[in-house]
Amino acid sequence: MVRRDTSPGPDHYPFRNAAVTRLESFVVRGLPVSVENSRPDIATADVLARLDESLALIEQYQPWRLRHLRRDLNEIRVVRFPCRGAWLPVEGACVTELTFLNRRDISAAPVASSIIHEGMHARVDRMGVNRYARDRAREERLCRRAELEFGQSLPAELGRPVVERALESLTLADLEVAPAIDWNEALRRQNEIDRQAGA
């Protein structure tokens, strides 16, 4: 259920990567998707197939969550990023990390749960909660509970890694469940990984 989006779109991603070799727009299961592929060793078709597989799990086991994603997100953005997922509130974009989507040592379930997690941040924003005044740890736990519910809705073997990760994170202290991230260090590590991969 992947189709190329031929409509022109604004260039609104402020972290444009100078190494980008492929920037394309698609629609996957009714969601606009932009793919910014800076890794020549990763096929865009492969990450789109994994994204489609992940959204199909959401559609099959918790279809209301896919409806929420369609309503709450402006787009899913597949891009090289220092973590597996992020919510960009100014742009209404859910980031799903390029190499995370490309992994084949995990099933589509952790990818789907990451999208659900970021989608919950989008829902909180769309509900009008002030992002500067809200309790970050409480919001992270809300997102983790959504992941847990999703994992529990899946067949046991498929959902196990999602359930385990969500349960583990729900036991963390506030500063651990919503840690401050040193984005400069995270980006440095990402760049080092890309250099080692020859990207």
Tell me what each language-model feature is.
Residues 98-114, 134:
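Short pre-active-site segment immediately N-terminal to the catalytic Zn-binding motif
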Residues 156-199:
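Long, well-structured alpha-helical subdomains associated
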Residues 2-3, 8, 26-93, 153:
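Auxiliary, metal-adjacent structural segments of Zn-dependent hydrolase domains
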Residues 97-100, 124-132:
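Short acidic, glycine/Ser/Thr-rich loop/turn "cap" segments at secondary-structure junctions
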Residues 133-168:
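Post-HExxH zinc-binding segment in Zn-dependent metallohydrolases
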Residues 41-45, 130-136:
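Short, flexible/disordered intra-domain loops and linkers
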Residues 113-126:
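Active-site recognition of the HExxH zinc-binding catalytic motif
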Residues 2-8, 13-25, 30-35, 181-199:
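Cysteine-nucleophile amide-bond enzymes
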